[in-house]
């Protein structure tokens, strides 16, 4: 979603005119899919425990039909209209519609699907030509508030002002071309260029078992044909237990990366970069130091993590296959880091300089601080230590001030420098300065950029970012680096 400007909320009088109900009749939705896929229900016969864990998870419920039961369990009625420009919007949960009232009357848009649910529910309505469009109001699960979908997506890039949101009718908010691939399973877009229509279809809403394990029909047949008490040598299914760390990470990154697809099909176990082009710091949705500003998901920061670079860490060590965090209990908070950082975990107070058992003594408080964008929480998966010096330079967030909100970045910078005489912030500041210069087309720093690319200590994300931006310099010295 691309921010274009800041919304001016002007109230308009609601006219008591007849309600027009907006429909779209094209064939977009659930369809039977063959090609060896049998559906998640077929897994339940032998894997009831995992089926229950999956079906109640945010993976299994990544998208679901809007129902009265969902509304009763997860949503609270909207008490006041939301004004967006000259229009007013309200969700009528009992009727399953969002009404739009304005100078030309009132329209009602059917709520057909609910998207998400961990932090936010977005809602989809049928639009002409087979499109599913994100409705203009969404629901904050934790705050129990309704809010303006598009206004929440404004980036507020440093040094800019006057931003305004994209209209909710914009193609940026069309499900068929945006968020479809990670909220339903076995999807085909079925776009007809000549008629500009979609017949987008999927096997199941949510992320199903076969998304990670591949088609299961052959597996089901093999298991049913096996003699009682025996297991076939060839299970005819993808066994993620046999994956390397890189294969695990690649399989998760398909949905947890900001990227551009290069091929139409990814099979779990494939190499990520054979199928996708990862967005790096050429995108202003990142601060120059690599911290998140806008919507970036996880994988770019993950590739910057020293823990990941060591080669053994993968997503399923901290998260279950259904997406749950394994260390949510307070007593287990630091166990995620225990296998590799035993000495520090066992004496966390000395390492963190925070009282044992306090929020600041958790590893993730400093190394994976949580920020939010568009009301969606995300933890920093770079796992880098706090760098308040980059906050001073580039306004990026730092873990110290996310907790110590009564202090400023200068205080945090002085504190970490007093605690750590070795200036670990210097390399981060140096490479962030190169990204900042490249973004500003300040090619006086080109020699330093080339030196960084030649360094054995370079970070692949920062190096890739520079390589992508340097051609704008037009300088022939960049040729060897490219």
Please give the residue ranges for each predicted region:
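Positively charged n-region of N-terminal signal peptides that target proteins for export
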Residues: 1-5
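Bacterial N-terminal signal peptides
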Residues: 7-18
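Signal peptide processing junction and immediate N-terminal pro/mature segment
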Residues: 19-27
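Primarily the internal scaffold of c-type cytochrome electron-transfer domains
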Residues: 30-34, 41, 49-116, 120-128, ...
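Long, basic N-terminal domains or extensions that often function
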Residues: 178-183
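Alpha-solenoid HEAT/ARM repeat scaffold
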Residues: 461-464, 480
């Amino acid at each position: 979603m691309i921010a274009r400007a800041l919304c001016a909320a002007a109230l308009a009088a609601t006219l008591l005119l007849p309600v027009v109900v907006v429909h779209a009749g094209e064939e977009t939705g659930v369809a039977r899919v063959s090609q060896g896929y049998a559906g998640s229900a077929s897994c339940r016969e032998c894997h009831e425990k995992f089926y229950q864990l999956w079906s109640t998870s945010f993976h299994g419920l990544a998208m679901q039909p809007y129902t009265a039961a969902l509304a009763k369990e997860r949503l609270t009625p909207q008490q006041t209209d939301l004004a967006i420009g000259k229009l007013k919007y309200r969700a009528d949960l009992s009727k399953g519609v969002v009404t739009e009232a304005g100078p030309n009357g009132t329209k009602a848009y059917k709520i057909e699907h609910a998207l998400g649910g961990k932090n936010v529910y977005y809602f989809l309505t049928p639009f002409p030509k087979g499109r599913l469009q994100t409705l203009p109001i969404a629901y904050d699960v934790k705050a129990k508030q309704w809010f303006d979908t598009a206004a929440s997506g404004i980036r507020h890039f440093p040094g800019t002002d006057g931003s305004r949101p994209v209209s909710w009718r914009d193609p940026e908010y069309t499900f068929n071309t945006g968020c479809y691939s990670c909220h339903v399973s076995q999807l085909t877009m079925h776009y007809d260029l000549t008629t500009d229509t979609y017949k987008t279809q999927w096997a199941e809403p949510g992320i199903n078992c076969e998304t990670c394990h591949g088609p299961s029909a052959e597996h089901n047949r093999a298991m049913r044909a096996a003699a009682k008490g025996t297991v076939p040598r060839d299970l005819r299914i993808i066994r993620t237990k046999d994956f390397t760390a890189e294969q695990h990470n690649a399989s998760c990154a398909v949905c947890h990366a900001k990227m551009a697809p290069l091929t139409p099909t990814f099979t779990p176990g494939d190499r990520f970069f054979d199928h996708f082009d990862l967005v790096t710091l050429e995108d202003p949705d990142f601060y120059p130091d690599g911290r998140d500003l806008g919507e970036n998901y996880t994988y770019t920061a993950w590739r910057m993590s020293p823990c990941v670079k060591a080669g053994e860490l993968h997503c399923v060590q901290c998260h279950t296959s259904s997406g749950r965090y394994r260390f949510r209990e307070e007593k287990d908070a630091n166990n995620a880091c225990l296998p590799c950082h035993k000495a520090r975990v066992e004496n966390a107070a000395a390492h963190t300089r925070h009282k044992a058992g306090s929020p600041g003594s958790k590893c993730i408080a400093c190394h994976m601080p949580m920020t939010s964008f568009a009301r969606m929480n995300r933890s920093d998966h770079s796992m880098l230590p706090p760098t308040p010096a980059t906050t001073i330079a580039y306004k990026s967030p730092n873990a110290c001030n996310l907790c110590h909100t009564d202090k400023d970045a200068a205080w945090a910078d002085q504190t970490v420098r007093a605690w750590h005489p070795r200036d670990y912030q210097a390399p981060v500041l140096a490479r962030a300065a190169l990204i900042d210069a490249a973004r500003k087309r300040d090619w006086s720093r080109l020699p330093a950029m080339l030196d960084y690319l030649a360094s054995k200590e370079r970070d692949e994300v920062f190096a890739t970012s520079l390589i992508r931006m340097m051609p704008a310099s037009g300088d022939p010295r960049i040729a060897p680096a490219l």
